[in-house]
Amino acid sequence: ASIAKTAVGHLAATARESFASANNDLIKGKQWLSTLDNRTTPQCRIRDRLKYTLNNKPVGHSVPYLQGPGKIHFCCRSTETFILKSAKELGIDVRDISPAERASMDGVVAGDTTYREWFLRQPYTRQKQIVGESRAKLIRDGGMSPDEFYTDKGEWLTLKQLRERDAQVFRKAGI
């Protein structure tokens, strides 16, 4: 089943690439969408809602696209949505549509909710399931942000690397 899921995700990502290429007159970029639950990988959590050009270049951040959603790791459940050119960019005089909603394991959330925002609203027990007890303590008791668990290139830091960066936050969290 895992191999089939991975193959389907890879095929879907390849189809999206072909679609975007064929419609680049309407599409100005893409946005990574990660599944909002406790099984989402660190690689996908950091990339949730990040924008990229159609050539996979970061827009407003430095986290690389790598292989992209559906291809970045085995059993990847992330996807991407296309960012359409605005009506104004297309020469049409109408009001733009606001973002809608997106799904999470708890039901519908606002369409512009990022994984980070969703994560920070979760109870401590769920945060512990997602990032582990030490990292959950670093957030709750040490005052760390989930974003601090990554390099500026989106690489997941080990606890040892985090401690080397800021031992004080570990003491504050009682770790």
Predicted features and spans:
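Domain-core detector
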Residues: A1-H73, F82-I175
